[in-house]
């Protein structure tokens, strides 16, 4: 708080003292104005996230700016008048004939009784005998029947010896192994529960209510117990085998999101984390997603996961990942350009839209334009082989990246924007992350951003909005295992319900007397295995 001077004190001040007071007040006023601008920016950004579109694309931002001066922004006298052919609507493209037949060909068909016209009605309408039958008209409709329930009654033949060496000894028919001993759960029932909760992001209490509406009384506690027991017994070794596949790849990606676990928190509302690790975006042969629940967010968690890994890890700017780069000789950390541009996008969203010209000449907007050019070129290269993509990146993108960092350093050195503003924070971020942001230029298999892992974790983020929290660490760990399988199945074009049903049917057969599973036998059950039945695979539209 500045000292307040009375009129009498100011009248008694010398010229030099008055100059000192004025300069001091100007400095304080500049600081206040800077703080006010920063607070206004924060409010606008918060409102944008709350009420605006959650997009950072430059096209969307341009559209928002041009809304206020559409005529001036759209005016271009050099554009020629359009021809009549360009103005008049073209003939509508009709739907491909036979597509409905193709879509319905794999479903069972039921021929219904024909809709007949009686002879009496025909004679009345046409006159007696003045008619003949034509070819029948047929059409198809798709019928859906709600889920059905069947109680399976298994019969095991039992014999007893009445003489000889095995007198009074019992012999029973060989029965299949139960999924869970003594439980009524079957692979199809548990697969249905897993599909609703983890694939369709519904809470177990809603599953319980739907079951009750169908006359089936299975509590959510029972369903939760089934999930945890099967996860520990079957899914844990299954996901371990998937993890081996992931860590054999040269490029992986990682991200994390907070979650609440009631029974594993030190204090109310404390955050635990669900980490996701996935194969690189350009690896299409055997894509893998691994979820991992951890109580904290320190670097020890990813350090343990990637301890024996040798390759490139694409992440956001979290310092924990940078420590992996320093502590693990085999790991190279690459940063995400989508995160690098976020602060600039926020700054443009928070700018005064009533003055589009000043926005488009701002440092933040220029930064977005430069980064958008990287993306535009890299998008053109997505379908190329890795070697060709690398060559094109070195030739076309690398000079632009070098120019961007030189420009960013110049803007920071000239203090063209307040350091604490979103633009200033963005400049500081990219300058300090320069080495990590350039890694994608060294290998054609490294993606420009970490969007693949963010897509992989999206299903979990949608789900936690519905079920809010986990009760125990065991439940969170079981969820991580199930999400790993379901998300990997989707990436491999499988139908999660049928895939869960199949592996839950097969996995009990792989258990020895102690309940252990040989990892090598799991290869034929992996989401990319050729041995999977056709019903597990997602049908392709021709």
Question: What is each residue range found by the language model?
Answer:
Residues 1-181, 224, 253-254, 393-396, ...:
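Short, flexible loop/hinge motifs at secondary-structure junctions
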